[in-house]
Structure formats: C-alpha cells, structure tokens
C-alpha cells in the first residue's frame, strides 16, 4: 500500500488510478525508472486513449518493484478492496495524529502537484506530469496543496511519529 501511495504522490495520480493498477500496467528498467499505463483514467476515457505517467524517482520505482515481484503477472497491485485501503488510510492518519488536517486519499495528488511545482518551479512540467490541460485547474491543485501545507502545524508527537514510520518506507 505504501508503494501505491508513493506512486500516486510522485505521479500526481487520481486515487482510482493508482488503486486499480495491475502489475501489467507498470514497466520499470534496471534503474527502477519507468512508465505506468493508465488504461482507465478520467481523461483517457473521454479521449479514447491510454494516458501514461512516468516514474523518474528510482526510490519510488524500487519500492513498487519490490511489491510487484511478489505478484503474478497482471495481478492487481492493491491486494484487497478499495474500501479496506480507505480504512487503513484513515487509521494511518489517526495513528499519526493527523485527523485534524483532514487528509483524504485525493490529497495525495494535490500534495504531489504542490511538491513538484515547489521543487522544480516549472508550471508546464507540473501540468504535463499531472496531465492537466488547463492552467487554471493545475493552479487550483498546486495552490490548495501549498496553502494546506503552509497552514499545517504539526505537534512534536506527530513529527516524531512521521519520522519513525518514514524509516519503514
């Protein structure tokens, strides 16, 4: 599950996109960089074509590869129902004392967009990676994610918990 969350964040994917992936949708090279085919993406369905997300962070690819090695070819990467993912996600937010932050699975895409824009300072890059054709919509995702991040005040306990659990990624 952690590998899918990392992929969703890195690839600025919609929740349904990363939760419905199969191992057959992912191609990684020996350096753990690669491509994810989104056969059922929102815009892909409208346009009648497959959309793609690139994995250019080898740590994301390596974690995804470790999960996929345990799966038969073309098996769903998420082993279990989506409803179970949502429960575990919410339980994780509670364990990290982040329920007041109101994080939801769709926050993963927004956070990824904000991180990408702040890291690279290139709106066109973020729009391309997030697959937005509208600057207006991309800015909503970026600005909203950035505002949430800037307004967030984490307690010492939450920071310590996040640091502790980060070691398991």
Enumerate the language-model features and the residues they cover.
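Short, leucine-enriched amphipathic alpha-helices that occur as contiguous helical runs
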Residues: 1-2, 82, 86, 109-110
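Basic, Lys/Arg- and aromatic-enriched nucleic-acid-binding interface segment
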Residues: 1-15
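C-terminal catalytic core of tyrosine-transesterase DNA break-rejoin enzymes
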Residues: 6, 107-133
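Mobile genetic element proteins and their domesticated derivatives, centered on retroelements
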Residues: 12, 38, 78, 89, ...
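Conserved tyrosine-mediated DNA breakage-rejoining catalytic core shared by Y-recombinases
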Residues: 20-63
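Short, polar N-cap/turn motifs at the start of nucleic acid-interacting alpha helices
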Residues: 27-28, 102, 121-142
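Active-site/catalytic core of tyrosine-dependent DNA strand-transfer enzymes
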Residues: 54-100
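DNA/chromatin major-groove-contacting recognition/catalytic segments
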Residues: 128, 139-169
């Amino acid at each position: 599950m952690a590998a899918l969350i990392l992929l969703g964040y890195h690839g600025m994917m919609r929740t349904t996109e990363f939760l419905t992936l199969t191992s057959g949708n992912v191609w990684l090279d020996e350096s753990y960089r690669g491509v994810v085919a989104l056969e059922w993406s929102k815009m892909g369905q409208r346009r009648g074509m497959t959309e793609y997300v690139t994995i250019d962070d080898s740590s994301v690819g390596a974690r995804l590869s470790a999960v996929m090695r345990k799966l038969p070819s073309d098996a769903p990467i998420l082993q279990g129902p989506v409803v179970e993912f949502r429960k575990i996600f919410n339980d994780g937010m509670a364990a990290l004392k982040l329920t007041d932050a109101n994080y939801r699975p769709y926050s993963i895409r927004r956070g990824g967009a904000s991180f990408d824009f702040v890291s690279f300072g290139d709106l066109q890059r973020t729009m391309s990676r997030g697959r937005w054709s509208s600057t207006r919509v991309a800015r909503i995702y970026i600005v909203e994610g950035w505002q949430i991040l800037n307004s967030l005040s984490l307690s010492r306990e939450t920071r310590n918990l996040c640091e502790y659990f980060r070691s398991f990624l």
